[in-house]
Amino acid sequence: MFPDIEVNDKGHLLIGGADAVELADEYGTPLYVIDEMRIRENYRRLYRAFSGEYSRFQVFYACKANTNLAVMRILEEEGSGIDAVSPGEIYTALMAGFDPDRILYTGNNVRDDELQFALDSGVRINVDSRSQLLRLSEIAPEGLRISFRVNPLVGAGHHEHCITGGEMSKFGVMEREAPEVYRMAMDLGFEPVGIHAHIGSGILDPEPFMLAVETLMDIAGRVHEATGVEFEFIDFGGGLGIPYTPEEEPLDIDEFASKITGLFKDKLSEYGLGRPMMCLEPGRYIVGDASYLLTRVNTIKESYRKFAGVDAGFNTLLRPAMYGSYHHILVAERPLDEPSEKMDVAGNVCESGDLFARDRQLPEINEGDVLAIMNAGAYSFSMSSQYNSRPRPAEVLVREGKVDVVRERETFSDLLRGQNVPARLLKR
């Protein structure tokens, strides 16, 4: 999964057949560059692996990873569904052309108007709590088909903030209460048809995922035995990781799929659950390594340490500051150069934690160089902000050298959009 480095006859980095240096020159920096074919290849690799083992398989892309409309259109063309966690994501998915039945809404701490929006949109609703179920029952039509998110008491992820299962998690119905909650839903006039869990993000070790699958299947079995619910789908969530460092090994997706589907089929047989749809909700696995963030070096500073200062900050790419995440960095003009000195790569936000790399061995870097920050496709633009009153960057989509602007660069006027000064504060 760690992308191979391609160069052109100038020695410049190629992304989707386009010269990264020329992209930076033409479209400005910072700039997100999205490789269309990498997204398609990642989706197809995963879909082939699982559907080859179990034909009733469906992907619901976790669009919180990257909600760019063009990215979502690509995945709609590929046959994916959408895992949406907010009304805004539902709206975006609908605008991207997804059929409502291919959108699974899994919100938490949801307002009544958000539930109404989901109902009006016709999407599938995945209920997170008793409270949500009771409030939904007051506005939902008789016989509404729903599913439940269950906390299987298994959690895993690349950082504690990304663990979404276990006793400390805010998400889902407690596993021991699952049969009771399904019965409650039936008594309220709902038709429960699915069960769901999601344990965390950035998982490269299959063992926690295997445990989560086993646990959720056991819960599904207990619910079926206690209530007679016939599951139309069982959704194991997402969390499949990608290597962020050159040393990390990617998931062997074929082996992973074989293990997961084998366990799934064994449990179906054990509990007499028939042949429901098996669902996964990958986000990072599909888009994570399909984008680069291009940023230009404007300052080389040598004080008590050496800094390469760039024109992006944690307002553009938050993960290193928030999670301490490693993102590999190339010099776009010379991507094959070997590391030669230790330095920090610092952003332009007025915070001491605004660093893309600390004490990193990097090639020679000069003012004016374009740095390419790799694996910037997931939880990157979608977590960006206007902090320090800096407009968000543009995004371009590349395929076989063709370039399309798929998000315009924000301007200063965008920083003030929606703001109003009361008349009493205006100068007379």
UniProtKB/Swiss-Prot annotation:
The answer, when asked if Oxidoreductase is one of the entry's keywords, is no
Q: What is its EC number?
A: 4.1.1.20
Report the top EC class in one word.
lyase
Q: What are the leading ranks of the lineage?
A: Archaea, Methanobacteriati, Methanobacteriota, Methanomada group, Methanobacteria
Q: What does this protein do?
A: Specifically catalyzes the decarboxylation of meso-diaminopimelate (meso-DAP) to L-lysine.
Q: According to its UniProt record, which protein family does this protein belong to?
A: Belongs to the Orn/Lys/Arg decarboxylase class-II family. LysA subfamily.
Q: Which domain of life is it from?
A: Archaea
* Protein name according to UniProt: Diaminopimelate decarboxylase
Q: Which Gene3D superfamilies match?
A: Alanine racemase, Lyase, Ornithine Decarboxylase, Chain A, domain 1
Q: Which cofactor does it need?
A: pyridoxal 5'-phosphate
Q: Where is the active site?
A: C350
Which is one GO molecular function term here? pyridoxal phosphate binding
In this UniProt entry, the residues modified to N6-(pyridoxal phosphate)lysine are K64
Assembly, per entry: Homodimer.
Give the reaction(s) catalysed.
meso-2,6-diaminopimelate + H(+) = L-lysine + CO2
Pathway, per Swiss-Prot/TrEMBL?
Answer: Amino-acid biosynthesis; L-lysine biosynthesis via DAP pathway; L-lysine from DL-2,6-diaminopimelate: step 1/1
Alphabetically sorted, this entry's keywords are: Amino-acid biosynthesis, Decarboxylase, Lyase, Lysine biosynthesis, Pyridoxal phosphate
Keyword Repeat assigned to the entry: answer is no
